[in-house]
Curated annotation (Swiss-Prot):
This is Pyrroline-5-carboxylate reductase 2. It is an enzyme of class 1 (oxidoreductase). It is found in: Cytoplasm; Mitochondrion. The lineage of its organism: Eukaryota, Metazoa, Chordata, Craniata, Vertebrata. The modification N-acetylserine is found at residue 2. NADP(+) binds at residues 6-11, 34, 56, 69-72, 95-97.
Length: 320
């Protein structure tokens, strides 16, 4: 099996690092395309031994599982470019926030009648094999296609299938969740420093506290509120700290953050549907170079046989 990434940014880099660390894929079985070969993430992929190219079409030709790892507003343009190269063997996995299965299928069906599309939402902790991933399969994807993706993503953390209408909300929960945690850790460390704890130690202790709390929750059947209560002694320091958090609207802020991320995800889908790109986004993503077909760099591997090693499409069955 070979895996391709259209887009060589943070997500592609994290997944490639996770897959190789887990031992499920060798670096030479991975290819990523980017119009900009000077990106730090491209350099990191190169050091891993991942094949690199400027041509999105070459990425399609050299892969079986194809991850669309670009910004949502770029997806329609990418699909127009690569659609003619997508074959029956390909599993097209969209990782773009808000981009629906139907919108990807509609674009690809202009080139072939039954594209196999899966929508996926993961997060950056896949790099340390502690990711949180959900996916939903499209109209023409086989049951085996979903299981193959689940096997791949389970090697870098937790992965489960969900109904597609949950994915926008999950984007706000676990997709954006690591950013909330990093902000909280930064603030916790600042609090420690304010009270005299050295910065390095404050960061380590804060991170360990959150890691331990998460592991306690995952290893138990207790409600988070019960585990919180277990830390609070009557009249103690922790309950006073929690009262201060409550007075600042701590819970409401987190709830509203998940909601805001979910709403923005749906806005991004609307932009993608309209094939609308703001001037700032156009400049940032170098859209004119995304469509540029250039010769591949020297690390490009020879073409694969075009068949998945772990499944036989002829034996697959469509999802009921």
């Amino acid at each position: 099996m070979s895996v391709g990434f259209i887009g060589a940014g943070q997500l592609a880099c994290a997944l490639a690092r996770g897959f190789t660390a887990a031992g499920v894929l060798s670096a030479h079985k991975i290819i990523a395309s980017s119009p900009d070969m000077d990106l730090p993430t491209v350099s990191a992929l190169r050091r891993m031994g991942v094949n690199l190219t400027r041509s999105n079409k070459d990425t399609v030709r050299h892969s079986d599982v194809l991850f669309l790892a670009v910004k949502p507003h770029i997806i329609p343009f990418i699909l127009d470019e690569i659609g003619a190269d997508v074959q029956e063997r390909h599993i097209v996995v969209s990782c773009a926030a808000g981009v629906t299965i139907s919108s990807v299928e509609k674009k690809l069906m202009a080139f072939q009648p039954a594209p196999k599309v899966i929508r996926c939402m993961t997060n950056t902790p896949v790099v340390v094999r502690e990711g949180a991933t959900v996916y939903a399969t499209g109209t023409h994807a086989l049951v085996e296609d979903g299981k193959l993706l689940e096997q791949l993503m389970s090697s870098v953390g937790f992965c489960t299938e969900v109904e597609e209408d949950l994915i926008d909300a999950i984007t706000g929960l676990s997709g954006s969740g690591p950013a909330y945690a990093f902000m909280a850790l930064d603030a916790l460390a600042d609090g420690g420093v304010k009270m005299g704890v050295p910065r390095r130690l404050a960061v380590r202790l804060g991170a360990q506290a959150l890691l331990g709390a998460a592991k306690m929750l995952l290893d138990s059947e207790d409600h988070p509120g019960q585990l919180k209560d277990n830390v609070c002694s009557p009249g103690g320091a922790t309950i006073h700290a929690l009262h201060f958090l409550e007075s600042g609207g701590f819970r409401s802020l987190l709830i509203n953050a998940v909601e805001a991320s979910c709403i923005r995800t749906r806005e991004l889908q609307s932009m993608a549907d309209q094939e609308k790109v703001s001037p700032a986004a156009l400049k940032k993503t170098l859209l004119d170079r995304v469509k540029l077909e250039s010769p591949t760099v020297s690390t490009l591997a020879p073409p694969s046989s075009g068949k998945l090693l772990t499944r036989n499409p002829a034996q697959g069955s469509k999802k009921e």
